[in-house]
A protein has these predicted regions:
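Glycoside hydrolase catalytic-domain context in secreted enzymes
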Residues: 9-310
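Short, small-residue-biased leader/transition segments that mark boundaries at the very start
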Residues: 1-4
Length: 310
């Protein structure tokens, strides 16, 4: 619902010659009423750009799926010319002309490269950190990118974990302040401006606390420790108005975060009042089969019912 509005609202006047619905709800309901079930499912798909990066967009398999309404967005596609070429397929050749979202890992800069997140956090300089995200947003948006998979705010206290350098370290307060600064830097005060991009706080939740420091491993933690030591940076990003949240790979209470309704609905939606959209990490849904949660159809339903939207 939210994803459809974010991607279509920018193109509503150009793509629809009739008078656009007055409110967001009316706009979305009108669009949904015209969509087939396959097109609705298609909006859930966020594939990598695949052969578009090496071949002509119009002749690629991904392009064919876009034309058939089976793709909601793409990630890891770069350059204005390539993004424009692919977007034209969506808004000119697909039945409903719903534009695509374009996401990329804009982590510590885009064209201008800043220190890694752990290095930035060591400055304790929030205006500087916010400014780095703002510069990255300006450069990425100029290239046609709408959405970054950042900030990563996972608290980590085990140096064996291989992704420590991507976060802000072990301190929940510092991590929370950086989360707010990064969200503000990326999104600014108005996401409709063409020099801002949608932020995505990740990886929700507890991804930096796997047993033995092994990536993707399970997490066994009390609720008191979760809320006091690991949740604060995610909550700070939500309070700052982050537009999207990425689910983590790890299990929490024996259930992968991607299919964990307590985490994605009870905590994120009901307790924290988050009103953006939730995306899986790369292959997050099929990897639940390795956790023994069922076949692909079963884990897909588990994720959707838990609150996953893309």
């Amino acid at each position: 619902y939210t994803t459809l509005f974010r991607s279509t609202s920018l193109f509503a006047q150009k793509g629809n010659k009739t008078k656009a619905p007055v409110s967001k709800s009316e706009f979305i309901e009108d669009l949904l009423s015209k969509m087939t079930l396959d097109e609705k499912i298609g909006q859930l798909n966020l594939p990598t750009s695949g052969d578009i990066t090496t071949g002509q967009a119009n002749s690629s398999n991904v392009a064919k799926n876009i034309e058939e309404g089976k793709v909601g967005g793409l990630f890891n596609i770069k350059t204005v010319s390539k993004i424009r070429e692919v977007q034209k397929i969506a808004v000119e050749k697909s039945r409903l002309k719903i534009p695509l979202l374009f996401g990329m890992d804009v982590i510590h800069g885009y064209e201008t490269t800043f220190p890694i997140p752990l290095g930035l956090s060591s400055t304790w300089n929030m205006p500087l950190i916010e400014r780095s995200a703002q510069i990255a947003a300006k450069e990425a948006s100029a290239d046609g990118i709408n959405w970054t998979f950042s900030p990563m705010v996972d608290i980590s206290r085990d140096p064996r974990w291989g992704r420590v350098s991507e976060g802000s370290g072990e301190d929940a307060y510092l991590g929370s302040q950086i989360a707010k600064a990064m969200v503000k830097g990326y999104q600014g005060n108005d996401l409709s401006l063409n020099n801002t991009i949608l932020a995505c706080v990740k990886h929700f939740a507890l991804y930096g606390a796997p047993e033995a420091g092994r990536d993707y491993n399970t997490v066994d933690m009390s609720r008191i420790r979760m809320y006091n030591e690991y949740f604060p940076p995610y909550k700070a990003a939500v309070d700052a108005g982050v537009g999207s949240v990425m689910a983590s790979f790890n299990e929490i209470d024996g259930i992968p975060a991607t299919g964990n309704k307590w985490l994605m609905t009870d905590v994120l939606r009901k307790q924290w009042k988050f009103n953006g959209f939730v995306v899986t990490d790369y292959t997050g849904i099929p990897e639940m089969t390795d956790h023994g949660m069922g076949d692909l159809q079963t884990v897909s339903a588990l994720a959707l019912n838990a609150g996953i939207e893309l």
